[in-house]
Amino acid sequence: MSSTSQKHRDFVAEPMGEKSVQCLAGIGEALGHRLEEKGFDKAYVVLGQFLVLKKDEELFKEWLKDICSANAKQSRDCYGCLKEWCDAFL
């Protein structure tokens, strides 16, 4: 099993609330700005897309690549973060 970042652990440790999209694991400043420009300014907005895609890993990673040019590691980290958050809070 791969280890998770501190950012990932911090995110999944509590309810999402109004956290910025940049609080998601795998999403740094550059990707965060690209997502914000497309209207995905909060983590919960990205969660909405994750749920619309029925938590499908490949569809979500492809969407993230298309919308903000996320690479494989970034999209995998973001997917894992949202999946673990959903497992804990939904």
From Swiss-Prot:
One of its GO terms (biological process) is negative regulation of protein ADP-ribosylation. GO terms for cellular component: chromatin; condensed chromosome; cytoplasm; nuclear envelope; nucleus. InterPro entries: BAF, BAF_prot, BAF_sf. Phosphorylated during S and M phases. It is found in: Nucleus; Chromosome; Nucleus envelope; Cytoplasm. The keyword Cytoplasm applies. GO terms for molecular function: DNA binding. Keywords: Chromosome, Cytoplasm, DNA-binding, Nucleus, Phosphoprotein. Its main location: nucleus. The keyword Amino-acid biosynthesis does not apply. Homodimer. Interacts with nemp1a and nemp1b. Has a helix-hairpin-helix (HhH) structural motif conserved among proteins that bind non-specifically to DNA. Non-specific DNA-binding protein that plays key roles in mitotic nuclear reassembly, chromatin organization, DNA damage response, gene expression and intrinsic immunity against foreign DNA. Contains two non-specific double-stranded DNA (dsDNA)-binding sites which promote DNA cross-bridging. Plays a key role in nuclear membrane reformation at the end of mitosis by driving formation of a single nucleus in a spindle-independent manner. Belongs to the BAF family. This is Barrier-to-autointegration factor A. It comes from Xenopus laevis. The lineage of its organism: Eukaryota, Metazoa, Chordata, Craniata, Vertebrata.
